[in-house]
């Protein structure tokens, strides 16, 4: 087992759990007011659930134990712009963390983790772009 890799993947798993909770909250808070964006929150929540499952599966494959502690929720809001800003920030943090883990995976030549992280990173970048576009639209 590579304890450093397991710790890094557990940090990412923790953050995915936070993202799921954040997107669920945003979905529930804005769905009656902003029906045009609510499906994006729901879709991204599903993507983050998939990421969490992939991370947990990889941690088990590395003979580690997935974390179940969740701390650090964003302040809950009913304001769409604030919600989108929180989501842009969360995606930026995810991109930064996944890039760091990818660098380490490449350093230790962990091909399975590299493939998983490259796919997740592509989705996270897409999420960030989408949230940035929605934020720009909401501020017009």
Task: Please annotate each region the language model reported.
Residues 1-140:
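Iron-associated oxidoreductase/ferritin-like identity signal
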């Amino acid at each position: 087992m590579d304890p450093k890799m397991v710790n890094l993947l557990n940090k990412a798993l923790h953050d995915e759990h936070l993202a799921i909770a954040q997107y669920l909250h945003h979905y529930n808070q804005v769905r009656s007011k902003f029906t045009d964006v609510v499906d994006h929150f729901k879709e991204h929540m599903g993507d983050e659930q998939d990421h969490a499952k992939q991370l947990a599966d990889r941690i088990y494959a590395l003979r580690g134990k997935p974390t179940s502690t969740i701390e650090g929720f964003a302040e809950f809001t009913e304001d769409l712009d604030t919600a989108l800003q929180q989501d842009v920030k969360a995606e930026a943090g995810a991109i930064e963390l996944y890039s760091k883990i990818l660098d380490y995976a490449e350093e230790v030549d962990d091909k399975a983790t590299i493939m998983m992280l490259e796919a997740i990173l592509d989705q996270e970048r897409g999420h960030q772009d989408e949230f940035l576009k929605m934020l720009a639209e909401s501020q017009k």
